[in-house]
């Protein structure tokens, strides 16, 4: 009577559930490097870290560089090779930007984990992994920590260095206090070159059977500005959109630009032409229409910067003045000022140059 619910049926259900979970997983996680050999274009860091696998003598580390260059992926790949998937659960503490980063979290959560006695590995883990006698605390986006929290962290690093190693990850190394940075081995993660990034995007699109028009992957890379994580996410979002359009539909550059919130080139040229006219009423009218269409003023600032600064038709003095106006507007937008007013002010001032 209950034959259909035997062990074989349960295994099939479990396998199906695992496949569905993998299919729904973000591609950023699905294609994250599983070991150091899979880390792309960070040869120096990978070479040095591979040596630690042989000696199991790991220093405190500071990974810094632009977003989406593999900093977090590299330390996670290293910990997998050091401990294996099972022991990692008890040996690794990872805190990221979603966690409280003040002095209290350092004094409580970080300190409590750092002082724990290292658990004994299983026989299986010892046979297959180095399993060094220390834990690792990964602090992602450490440059967002307050100076007081960083000072408290320095004392914790000194006290528990016998049983705990720290890996600090940040975009801006200058925001890490010197007493903390001096206790770490620094690894600079450079922005991925175009060929490596394109190869990775092409590999993922082939694995996922995603079809793209010519130049789409290059456009994704251009929009993501070297951030491979953002590029992979954008590729996945575009693939979902193409699926809804029906079988055989390719991802187009237009779809990618719409998903990324990029202002289309023809609209950007219209803005430039309105600025050239120098007519305040025309500029004001166009800005009103533009903002009602839902475009972002920040995107316009970035694209105007690219248009004017890379254009050889403008002299150096004009570019200097444009750069200052764009910098001022970008700063004000980041401080939360009104987008409509700032965009209007920017375009009017450019028209007066």
Curated annotation (Swiss-Prot):
The modification N-acetylmethionine is found at residue 1. Keywords: Acetylation, ATP-binding, Cell cycle, DNA replication, DNA-binding, Nucleotide-binding, Nucleus. InterPro entries: AAA+_ATPase (IPR003593), ATPase_AAA_core (IPR003959), DNA_pol3_clamp-load_cplx_C (IPR008921), DNA_Rep/Repair_Clamp_Loader (IPR050238), P-loop_NTPase (IPR027417), Rep_factorC_C (IPR013748), RFC_lid (IPR047854). It comes from the Eukaryota. GO terms for biological process: DNA damage checkpoint signaling; DNA repair; DNA replication checkpoint signaling; DNA-templated DNA replication; leading strand elongation; mismatch repair; mitotic sister chromatid cohesion; sister chromatid cohesion. Pfam families: AAA, RCF1-5-like_lid, Rep_fac_C. It is found in: Nucleus. The keyword Cell cycle applies. ATP binds at residues 28, 32, 65-73, 171, 229. Its main location: nucleus. GO terms for cellular component: Ctf18 RFC-like complex; DNA replication factor C complex; Elg1 RFC-like complex; nucleus; Rad17 RFC-like complex. GO terms for molecular function: ATP binding; ATP hydrolysis activity; DNA binding. Component of ATP-dependent clamp loader (RFC and RFC-like) complexes for DNA clamps, such as the POL30/PCNA homotrimer and the checkpoint clamp DDC1:MEC3:RAD17 complex. During a clamp loading circle, the RFC:clamp complex binds to DNA and the recognition of the double-stranded/single-stranded junction stimulates ATP hydrolysis by RFC. The complex presumably provides bipartite ATP sites in which one subunit supplies a catalytic site for hydrolysis of ATP bound to the neighboring subunit. Dissociation of RFC from the clamp leaves the clamp encircling DNA. Present with 4610 molecules/cell in log phase SD medium. Replication factor C (RFC) is a heteropentamer of subunits RFC1, RFC2, RFC3, RFC4 and RFC5 and forms a complex with POL30/PCNA in the presence of ATP. Component of the RAD24-RFC complex which consists of RAD14, RFC2, RFC3, RFC4 and RFC5 and associates with the checkpoint clamp DDC1:MEC3:RAD17 complex. Component of the ELG1-RFC complex which consists of ELG1, RFC2, RFC3, RFC4 and RFC5. Component of the CTF18-RFC complex, which consists of CTF18, CTF8, DCC1, RFC2, RFC3, RFC4 and RFC5. RFC2 interacts with ECO1. Belongs to the activator 1 small subunits family. This is Replication factor C subunit 2.
């Amino acid at each position: 009577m209950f034959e259909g619910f035997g062990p074989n049926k349960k295994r099939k259900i479990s396998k199906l559930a695992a496949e569905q979970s993998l299919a729904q997983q973000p591609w950023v996680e699905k294609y994250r490097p599983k070991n150091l050999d899979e880390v792309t274009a960070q040869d120096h860091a990978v070479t040095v870290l591979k040596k630690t696998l042989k000696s199991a003598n790991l220093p405190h580390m500071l990974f810094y560089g632009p977003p989406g260059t593999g900093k977090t992926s590299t330390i996670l790949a290293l910990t997998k090779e050091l401990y294996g998937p099972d022991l990692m659960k008890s040996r690794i503490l990872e805190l990221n930007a979603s966690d409280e980063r003040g002095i209290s979290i350092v004094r409580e959560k970080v300190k409590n984990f750092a002082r724990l006695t290292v658990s004994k590995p299983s026989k299986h883990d010892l046979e297959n992994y180095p399993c060094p006698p220390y834990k690792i605390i990964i602090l992602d986006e450490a440059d967002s920590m307050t100076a007081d929290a960083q000072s408290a962290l320095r004392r914790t690093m000194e006290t528990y260095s016998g049983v705990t190693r720290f890996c600090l990850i940040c975009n801006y190394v200058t925001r890490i206090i010197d007493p903390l940075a001096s206790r770490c081995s620094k690894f600079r993660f450079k922005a991925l070159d175009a060929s490596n990034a394109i190869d990775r995007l092409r590999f993922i699109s082939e694995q996922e059977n995603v079809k793209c028009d010519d130049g789409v992957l290059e456009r994704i890379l251009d929009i993501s500005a070297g951030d491979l994580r953002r590029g992979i996410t954008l590729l996945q979002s575009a693939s979902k959109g193409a699926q809804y359009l029906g079988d055989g539909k390719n991802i187009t550059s237009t779809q990618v630009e719409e998903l990324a919130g990029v202002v289309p080139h023809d609209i950007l040229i219209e803005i430039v032409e309105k600025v050239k006219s120098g007519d305040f009423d025309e500029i004001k009218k166009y800005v009103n229409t533009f903002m009602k269409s839902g475009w972002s003023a920040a995107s316009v600032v970035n694209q105007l910067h690219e248009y004017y600064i890379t254009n050889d038709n403008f002299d150096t003095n004009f570019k200097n003045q444009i750069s200052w106006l764009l910098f001022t507007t970008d700063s004000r937008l980041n401080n939360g000022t009104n987008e409509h007013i700032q965009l209007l002010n920017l375009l009017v001032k450019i028209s007066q140059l």
